[in-house]
């Protein structure tokens, strides 16, 4: 059914090449579209998402996308297992995106003030960390989806954001008190702040570091400790995340070469989370691993680098197919994992988006693999780059 309004407002992640944009309807930043016009590439959509655009107003008459009415207002007919996730909707999605963007902006402001030698106040970041924890309890999967959105040129802030989200998720799974989760989340947001002291030629080197350069890189942990220990409002737990996330069980970590029982629960948690996010991230000099590959790295390091029990629990809390993972279904369609299924981990709720043999995007469909009578199942995980898919458009 065609929308009754000629200029519907849609979430930016529904924007497709062929749609004609006439205005930004809502956003988190101050960016404005220089000129209205036809969207011709997915890269244009990516730019809008990265700059904080949340919704856009589309002109149906001037759009050139076949079946645009169906894209904006999907057909009410659903196959077996089709779902509308509980608590879903544009309002919830926009709220969570705003929270994510607000945290990113506050991170940037904190770092700018540090570099300029200006007074710093963690109160706004502490407030957003508390809101992130609250959201993890109500819409945790949606938060984890945002942790899959990455840009190679923004690694430092995105890595810290993701570590914060992953620590909140891990801590919730372990049953930690909310006050502790808030500290871990804020510690994650600030855990790599000392890298502002690391020379860019070392921090962003497109290749393997020399021994001397690696020594310089290691100093970021000391810098983080020095900065945060002199910042009002920083707790011992937050300091521990920043100072100890590179320590390892066998004493091969840094900077203090702590060993065994010297590594607290929070240190062990932050080490696991930091490595998981780092190896799954795309960098200028390397392609990120898929989550299942990252799990293998963690499992390979148990009892040497990582606590075996905690690694097992981390993998369980993330799920066999972590939220935000692109998977191939048994009918050659690609889907993004959107919600975990703790009772049946192999059957999450997914969002179907693409056909691999016909090589084209599909009308987005939510599908609960536990409720489709076995009609479809996951065959494998897929690297989005193989099909030129940007997950930011679908999570």
Give, region by region, the residue ranges found by the protein language model:
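Histidine- and acidic-residue-rich, metal-dependent catalytic cores
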Residues: 93-94, 98-395
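Membrane-cytosol interface segments
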Residues: 1-120, 376-395
């Amino acid at each position: 059914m065609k929308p009754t309004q000629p200029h519907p407002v849609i979430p930016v992640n529904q924007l497709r090449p062929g749609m004609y944009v006439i205005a930004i309807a809502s956003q988190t930043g101050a960016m404005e579209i220089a000129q209205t016009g036809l969207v011709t590439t997915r890269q244009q959509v990516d730019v809008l998402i990265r700059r904080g655009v949340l919704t856009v107003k589309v002109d149906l008459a001037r759009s050139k996308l076949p079946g645009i009415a169906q894209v904006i207002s999907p057909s009410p007919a659903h196959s077996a297992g089709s779902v509308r996730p509980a608590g879903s909707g544009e309002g919830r999605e926009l709220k969570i995106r705003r929270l994510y963007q607000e945290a990113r902006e506050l991170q940037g402001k904190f770092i700018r003030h540090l570099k300029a030698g200006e007074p710093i106040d963690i109160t706004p970041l502490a407030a957003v960390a508390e809101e992130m924890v609250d959201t993890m309890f109500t819409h945790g999967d949606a938060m984890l989806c945002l942790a899959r959105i990455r840009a190679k040129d923004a690694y430092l802030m995105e890595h810290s954001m993701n570590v914060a989200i992953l620590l909140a998720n891990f801590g919730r799974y372990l049953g930690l008190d909310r006050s502790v989760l808030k500290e871990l989340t804020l510690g994650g947001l600030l855990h790599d702040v000392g890298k502002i002291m690391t020379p860019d030629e070392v921090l962003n080197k497109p290749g393997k570091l020399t021994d001397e350069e690696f020594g310089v890189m290691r100093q970021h942990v000391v810098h983080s400790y020095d900065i945060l220990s002199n910042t009002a409002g920083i707790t011992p737990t937050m300091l521990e995340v920043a100072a100890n996330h590179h320590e390892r069980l066998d004493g091969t970590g840094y900077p203090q070469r702590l060993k065994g029982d010297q590594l607290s629960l929070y240190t062990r948690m932050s080490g696991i989370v930091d490595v998981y996010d780092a190896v799954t991230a795309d960098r200028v000099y390397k392609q990120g691993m898929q989550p299942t590959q990252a799990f293998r790295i963690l499992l390979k390091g148990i009892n040497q680098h990582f606590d075996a029990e905690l690694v097992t629990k981390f993998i369980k809390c993330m799920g066999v197919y972590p939220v935000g993972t692109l998977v191939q279904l048994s009918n050659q369609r690609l889907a993004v994992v959107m919600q975990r299924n703790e009772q049946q981990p192999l059957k999450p709720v997914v969002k179907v988006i693409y056909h691999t043999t016909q090589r084209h995007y599909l009308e987005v469909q939510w599908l609960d693999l536990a409720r489709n009578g076995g009609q479809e199942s996951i065959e494998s995980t897929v690297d989005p780059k193989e099909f030129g898919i940007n997950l930011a458009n679908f999570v």
